[in-house]
A protein has these predicted regions:
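Predominantly soluble domains enriched in secretory-pathway, periplasmic, or organellar proteins
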Residues: 1-284
Length: 284
């Protein structure tokens, strides 16, 4: 069996499953109607359900429910504060971010977040929350403690995702050609604009690079946002990807399947009915 840190949890198909890649056998599973976006942290896993707009809290080892909280409509993304005490939920249909007490589920704050917001990201300190505010064409920087608005950053199109790293904001936007634009706004200096092939999906910063997932591609960009370093063909449009050893796992938002790419570059189907996946232990 793989080490604990290499287990992943997958939601979708009205259930939550645990795998130990590259193995494809299900280690644990629980049926949860409408299982969607996940957030895993330490002893707990949070799973949003569109059945009743609820959030389930599960024991990460036994995969049994330990709490049930009221959430909101169309929960696209969930993040947990570094201390594990606050759960931030992006509710797209409500155009808002909901802050819950992660222990008892009590609502703390509700803040407006643009029009049809798509995703959000915390900075390294856990103090600043960036929201890709969707059709309002902007990125909102909020206090992760109070959801107070800190800064509003206009963008050149619909914003699909955002990432924060070392004070720099990275936003992935839909442009007029139905491809992607990466906007990089450093702490000091001029913003950078870079065009990328494919409709926008997700963005992350890893191993000193910016990785942008668009429909059909994974683009690697320099941290200054100025240079396209590499482009790989992939299946569909990645909503999240994880690396386990030499295996790249990619969750395709279009087919709701997870595909695995081995060290030799060959792709295969890992599992079906997947809306989200996370490492089982660690931050969501």
């Amino acid at each position: 069996m793989a080490a604990m840190g290499k287990r992943i949890i997958v939601s979708g198909g009205d259930e939550v499953r645990v795998f130990a890649p590259p193995g494809r056998g299900v280690l644990e599973h629980i049926r949860l109607e409408g299982a969607g976006t996940l957030c895993a942290c330490g002893e707990h896993v949070f799973c949003a359900s569109n059945w009743g707009d609820m959030v389930w809290r599960l024991d990460a080892q036994k995969l049994v429910p330990t709490g049930l909280f009221a959430g909101g409509p169309d929960m696209r993304n969930m993040l947990i504060s570094p201390d594990g005490e606050r759960l931030m939920i992006l509710c797209a249909e409500a155009d808002s971010v909901l802050l819950l007490d992660a222990v008892c589920g009590a609502p703390m704050v509700l803040a407006r977040a643009g029009v049809n917001p798509q995703h959000m990201s915390l900075d390294e300190s856990g103090e600043v929350l960036a929201v890709a505010a969707g059709e309002s064409g902007e990125v909102l920087l909020l206090s992760a403690q109070s959801l107070a608005l800190l800064r509003r950053l206009p963008m050149p199109g619909i914003v699909l995702d955002v990432a924060l790293r070392a004070g720099t904001v990275y936003a992935l936007c839909l442009n007029e050609t139905l491809n992607s634009t990466l906007v990089t706004i450093p702490r000091a200096g001029a913003r950078q604009i870079l065009s990328l092939s494919g409709m926008p999906g997700r963005i992350t910063c890893e191993r000193g690079d910016v990785i942008c997932a668009t429909e059909g591609f994974l683009h690697t960009v320099s941290m200054d946002g100025m240079r396209l370093l590499d482009t790989r063909r992939v299946s569909g449009r990645a909503s999240i990807w994880l690396t386990v050893g030499e295996t790249l796992l990619l969750c395709d938002a279009l087919s709701e399947c997870i595909f695995a790419r081995n060290g030799g570059g060959q792709w295969s189907l890992f599992c079906e009915h997947a809306r989200d996946m996370r490492f089982l232990f660690g931050k969501g």
